[in-house]
Amino acid sequence: MVLKELRQKRPLVHNITNYVVAQFVANGLLALGASPLMSDAIDEMQDLAKISDALAINIGTLNERTILCAKEAIKHYKALNKPIVLDPVGCSASALRHDTSLELLESEGISALRGNAAELGSLVGISCESKGLDSHDATTPVEIIKRAAQKYSVIAVMTGKTDYVSDGKKVLSITGGSEYLALITGAGCLHAAACASFLGLKKDPLDSMVQLCALYKQAAFSAQKKVLENNGSNGSFLFYFLDALSLPIKLENSLIKEEW
């Protein structure tokens, strides 16, 4: 299992992430078994690319400086053939986010694209609402994820009540998880960083992303059980979730289904 190897090798994951979630992402990676590195200083991108195993780019608090930093980082990680995960946070909400996401994808250095239905849909020309597919659009999540993977030659990861992962040839779904993931800030941001940590091991990328999604959902479900047992809520879920990520997690293959 990929998680066991991750905890043995502790890959170094460089994060260019948003300032709202940086601490949570770093703690989540540590809990999972990876080593976080948080930096958006343009002048050190070349040096950090040499020592890191993977890069996670999150555009949650986008600005001119972080855009330039992301471009510089991609250039150096691409030259070293190291995996890069892009989390196009809110790219369906503004022209700046959408155009920046497209520009980063067109660099052809992105290994995995991770987002929700609205974000991935907007990047392949399909209108979706943040709470699900637009009622006027008959396109399924399977079609969206497949198009994203094929259009950008990436492993596409769509998270939600059901997660979907595709390499453009296959589409797999992963069920489970917890509704609390949508009630805390940073669950998706940490998920993208965790994707980078798994890809940093240089195993089969499709299988690695499927395993990560399943393990993430299992940890969330475990945390939810603790919350309910202790009459907790959002705040306690956050801490129980970090605990669950740090404990042994047995991969439940029953959560995984091949869709296409």
Curated annotation (Swiss-Prot):
Record field: catalytic activity: 5-(2-hydroxyethyl)-4-methylthiazole + ATP = 4-methyl-5-(2-phosphooxyethyl)-thiazole + ADP + H(+)
Q: Which GO terms describe its molecular function?
A: ATP binding; hydroxyethylthiazole kinase activity; magnesium ion binding
Q: List the disulfide bonds.
A: none
Write out the GO biological process terms. thiamine biosynthetic process; thiamine diphosphate biosynthetic process
**Domain of life from the UniProt record:** Bacteria
Q: Which InterPro entries match?
A: Hyethyz_kinase, Ribokinase-like
Q: Where does ATP bind?
A: R114, T159
Q: Which residues are involved in binding substrate?
A: M38, G186
List, alphabetically, the Gene3D superfamilies matched: 3.40.1190.20
What pathway annotation does it carry? Answer: Cofactor biosynthesis; thiamine diphosphate biosynthesis; 4-methyl-5-(2-phosphoethyl)-thiazole from 5-(2-hydroxyethyl)-4-methylthiazole: step 1/1
One short Pfam family name for this protein?
HK
Swiss-Prot/TrEMBL cofactor(s) = Mg(2+)
Q: What is its EC number?
A: 2.7.1.50
Q: What keywords is this UniProt entry annotated with? A: ATP-binding, Kinase, Magnesium, Metal-binding, Nucleotide-binding, Thiamine biosynthesis, Transferase
Q: Which family does it belong to?
A: Belongs to the Thz kinase family.
Any idea what job this protein has? Catalyzes the phosphorylation of the hydroxyl group of 4-methyl-5-beta-hydroxyethylthiazole (THZ).
Report what the protein is called.
Hydroxyethylthiazole kinase
The species this protein belongs to is Helicobacter pylori (strain G27)
